[in-house]
Swiss-Prot record:
Residues 28-32 are cytoplasmic. Belongs to the OST4 family. One of its GO terms (cellular component) is oligosaccharyltransferase complex. This is Probable dolichyl-diphosphooligosaccharide--protein glycosyltransferase 4 kDa subunit.
Amino acid sequence: MTDVQLQNIVTTFGISMMLLIILYHYLSRPQA
């Protein structure tokens, strides 16, 4: 596995986790 492939995997994983956290906070937020 090359460094570029590894970097792409890490970047994709980081973005996915960030989106999941944002979605979780949005859904868990009490509805006004």
